[in-house]
């Protein structure tokens, strides 16, 4: 890469004739132009910036992976009344997203007799009167205590719409 640090410009002298004058007139001028140096960009500096961007991206991906969620469909694609998957395992604090897949009214109630001791089922469940009526509606919960949790859809529990999650 070429850089310009300074340049000198000389204007040649001019000898001109004036009417009625026999003496030589001399005009001489010189000017010095200096340009400020351009900032030097180096591969080393730009690689440093790229490296910082890569580290930031990797860190945000690791943070996001710790906050992963599992999706559980309420109603199978074939129309059956089921949680899909009906049994699964998660890590403590991992979010479960229950999503109405069919448009039938569903809810998620954790069975107070089939959850770890010390866990309040009412704090992790929907009320039995609340329903996810439309396709795409969701209910989210994060379970912190290790153990097995049984849950059901109250309108369809008799039809076998039950599930179990294990927090490892």
UniProtKB/Swiss-Prot annotation:
Cellular component GO terms, alphabetical: chloroplast thylakoid lumen; chloroplast thylakoid membrane
Gene Ontology MF terms: copper ion binding; electron transporter, transferring electrons from cytochrome b6/f complex of photosystem II activity
Transit peptide extent on chain: 1-69
Plastocyanin-like domain location: 70-168
Subcellular localization(s) per the UniProt record: Plastid, Chloroplast thylakoid membrane
InterPro entries tied to this protein: BlueCu_1 (IPR000923), BlueCu_1_BS (IPR028871), Copper_blue_Plastocyanin (IPR001235), Cupredoxin (IPR008972), Plastocyanin (IPR002387)
Cofactor note: The crystal structure with reduced Cu(1+) has also been determined.
Entry protein name: Plastocyanin A, chloroplastic
Domain of life, per lineage: Eukaryota
Keywords on record: Chloroplast, Copper, Electron transport, Membrane, Metal-binding, Plastid, Thylakoid, Transit peptide, Transport
Function: Participates in electron transfer between P700 and the cytochrome b6-f complex in photosystem I.
CC cofactor: Cu(2+)
Gene transcribed to yield this protein: PETE
Membrane topology: Peripheral membrane protein
Classification via Pfam families: Copper-bind
Keyword Secreted found: no
Family: Belongs to the plastocyanin family.
Binding positions (Cu cation): 106, 153, 156, 161
UniProt keyword Membrane present: yes
């Amino acid at each position: 890469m070429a850089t310009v640090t300074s340049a000198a410009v000389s204007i040649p002298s001019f000898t001109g004739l004036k009417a009625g004058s026999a003496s030589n007139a001399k005009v001489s001028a010189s000017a010095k132009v200096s340009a400020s140096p351009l900032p030097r960009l180096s591969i080393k500096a730009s690689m440093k910036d790229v490296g910082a961007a890569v580290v930031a991206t990797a860190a945000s991906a690791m943070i996001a992976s710790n906050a992963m969620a599992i999706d559980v469909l309420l109603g199978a694609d074939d129309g059956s009344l089921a949680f899909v998957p009906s049994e699964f395992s998660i890590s403590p604090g991992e979010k479960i997203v229950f999503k109405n897949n069919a448009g039938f009214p569903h809810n998620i109630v954790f069975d107070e007799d089939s959850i770890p001791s010390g866990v309040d089922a009412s704090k992790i469940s929907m009320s039995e009167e609340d329903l996810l009526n439309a396709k795409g509606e969701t209910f989210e919960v994060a379970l912190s205590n290790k153990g097995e949790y049984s849950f059901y859809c109250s309108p369809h529990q008799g039809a076998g719409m039950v599930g179990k999650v294990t927090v490892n």
